[in-house]
Amino acid sequence: MFMGEYHHNLDSKGRLIIPAKFRDEIGEKMVFTRGMEGCIFGYPIEEWQKIEAKLAKLPLTKRSARKFTRLFYSGAMESEFDKQGRVNLTMTLKEHAALIKECVIVGVSNRIEIWSAERWNDFSEEANENYDDIAEDLDDIEL
């Protein structure tokens, strides 16, 4: 399970270090793709395979399913970590998440998320202001 918030910068070659705590759980490689709210989702291979199985069940006749899977897969990349624990994300993913220098890597249960520091700060500020309301909307799962 992934949890926590880590701050790292893209290096001069556009590579990003993934925290050792996450790498230990991930293994040698993972899949990155477009995430929601302008971030990047990163999945260990086993989790990615579960998502692939679910996406394969979406109806081809439904336009929203076609659009989503098209965007989700076209932005996806498999990546191995280099010896320093860095990944080299595609330009498509960096542009999607507006990654320029400062990044925030967040653990979210079965995935990691990579955010630009600016977008993460905006999201966190808004979410923290509405934390109780968000929790109330989820009351049916009985946290």
UniProtKB/Swiss-Prot annotation:
CDD domains: MraZ_C, MraZ_N. Keywords: Cytoplasm, DNA-binding, Repeat, Transcription, Transcription regulation. GO terms for cellular component: cytoplasm; nucleoid. Residues 5-47, 76-119 form the SpoVT-AbrB domain. It is found in: Cytoplasm, Nucleoid. Disulfide bonds: none annotated. Signal peptide: none annotated. GO terms for molecular function: DNA-binding transcription factor activity; transcription cis-regulatory region binding. SUPFAM superfamilies: AbrB/MazE/MraZ-like (SSF89447). PROSITE patterns: SPOVT_ABRB. One of its GO terms (biological process) is negative regulation of DNA-templated transcription initiation. It comes from the Bacteria. PANTHER family: TRANSCRIPTIONAL REGULATOR MRAZ (PTHR34701:SF1). Belongs to the MraZ family. Forms oligomers. This is Transcriptional regulator MraZ.
